[in-house]
Regions:
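Unchanged
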Residues: 1-161, 252-253
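Left-handed beta-helix
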Residues: 86-87, 107, 111-255
Length: 255
């Protein structure tokens, strides 16, 4: 909070760094303001198999969170089912899970930290404390695409899905465009390569025999005759800084 005190603001939005989703944060904020919440948690329904890995909650008809437990064991899950929209119920997603996305009033967050000076975990400490002490804590029901990519497997599969014809997270959706930072790289060059369901970044030179269901990162080089299937290639996306160049005692690029 010491760093946050250096700025003038009224609300604190905390986002998780290991998730893939597209959310209208303006709508998230709007609900927070309308309900005069002190804390709003973005939530999504999940199946029982996944519920043990998330913070699970129970809410009332006003979406106010009445109970919260972090990563419940399988033997108590029956006590944590919620009423969910029909399409989620049909998929057996009966458990309301925290997405790790929080919107706090500034003073609420400062107060919770002051009352819990040694607490460093929102799910295990801060949120249960806020609910038990009757702070106004609400759930924001998110219904779009969301994927936890906190494991190597989930990160890998989410990337491969991007190369499919109609992925759930669509990079080419005109209504939800995705922008990256601009780069001054040449177009990628393919030399006689057969490609099926592939995303290829800028600046690549590819002379493979075949690439199938793969994501090829920027400035990649793939040699003649290679067969690439179900691969996420991060690419040469690291640029050396000046200190790195000096430590190698080489002539800087461009001279």
């Amino acid at each position: 909070m010491t760093r946050l005190d250096e700025y003038d603001y009224n609300y604190v939005l905390i986002l998780s760094g290991d998730q893939l989703y597209q959310m209208d944060l303006a709508a998230f904020m709007q609900q927070h303001l309308e309900k005069e919440s002190e804390l709003t948690i973005a939530t999504i329904p999940v199946v029982a198999e996944d519920a043990t890995g998330f913070g699970i909650m129970k809410v009332n008809q006003e979406n106010e969170i009445e109970k919260f437990t972090e990563k419940p064991s399988a033997d108590v899950l029956s006590d944590w089912t919620s009423d969910v929209p029909e399409r989620y119920a049909a998929e057996k997603k009966h458990f309301l899970a925290s997405m790790g996305i929080y919107l706090f009033k500034k003073e609420t967050l400062k107060q919770l930290f002051a009352l819990n000076p040694s607490e460093v975990d929102f799910g295990k400490g801060i949120i249960p404390f806020a609910i038990n002490k009757f702070y106004k804590v609400h759930s924001y029901a998110y219904e779009g695409y969301w994927e936890d990519i906190g494991t190597i497997r989930s990160f890998f599969e989410a990337n491969l899905e991007l190369a499919m014809p109609l992925p759930r997270f669509n990079l080419y959706d005109a209504h939800n465009p995705v922008f990256t930072r601009s780069r001054m790289l040449s177009p990628s060059k393919l030399l006689g390569t057969s490609c099926t369901h592939v995303l290829i970044g800028d600046g690549c030179i590819i002379n493979a025999q075949e690439i199938t269901q793969s994501v090829i990162g920027i400035r990649s080089r793939i040699g003649k005759g290679s067969v690439v299937r179900r691969v996420v290639m991060m690419g040469m996306d690291m640029y050396e800084n000046y200190d790195d160049v000096l430590s190698q005692k080489i002539i800087p690029m461009g001279i």
